[in-house]
Amino acid sequence: MKKAEPRVIRLLMELRRMGVVDTRVLSAIERIPRALFVAEPFLDQAYENTALPIGCAQTISQPLVVGLMSQALEVGERMKVLEIGTGSGYQAAVLAKLCRRLYSVERHKPLLAEAEARFKHLRLHNITCRAADGSRGWPEQAPFDRIMVTAAAPDIPPALVDQLKPDGIMVLPLGDVGGIDQELVRITKTDRGIDIQPFLPVRFVPLVEGIPEE
């Protein structure tokens, strides 16, 4: 592996200081070039710890949030993972370095086409995508060991809980879809129902039902 460039090293050091300590997650972030997922006008900010616009009124998440969500998900290398909200594909690419198989759902077809081209370029052959309503999950491929949702919902989508394996973990932002009062939560599916652990205030775009005409 070639040596990481200084701006990547600076970002990794910042993430570690801010709580991303899982070495597998840090390694995945190091190996995925965020610049490939950022729009050209923002390339100079590709390795800054900030969210950036990507089109279709969506964003590529702040690297700290990507790191903390990936860490909270506790992904094992033999696991099957569902991601809701492919977006630029950056979070999916990081997860793909951690799991055996990743399924990712995106409602915006133009974003999905761009993300799939990036996955092909990076030879991430363990990612399968489709354009669909993310709130419904991917029932044909269920159950999943882990589920990550990258858009905020006012309540936990029941379909996603149904598609989670027993003892499975889901990480998602919950709260006001206007982005004022949201919190990342980690949900564990137990034989008694679900255990909910909030762990970080955030601001995400809303989880929207249906597929837009584009």
Swiss-Prot record:
Enumerate the active-site residues: 61
Summarize the protein's role.
Catalyzes the methyl esterification of L-isoaspartyl residues in peptides and proteins that result from spontaneous decomposition of normal L-aspartyl and L-asparaginyl residues. It plays a role in the repair and/or degradation of damaged proteins.
Q: By its UniProt entry, which Gene3D superfamilies does this protein fall under?
A: Vaccinia Virus protein VP39
Disulphide-bonded residues: none
Organism taxonomic ancestry: Bacteria, Pseudomonadati, Pseudomonadota, Alphaproteobacteria, Rhodospirillales
Q: Name one GO molecular function term.
A: protein-L-isoaspartate (D-aspartate) O-methyltransferase activity
For this chain, the family text in UniProt reads: Belongs to the methyltransferase superfamily. L-isoaspartyl/D-aspartyl protein methyltransferase family.
Q: What's the name of the protein?
A: Protein-L-isoaspartate O-methyltransferase
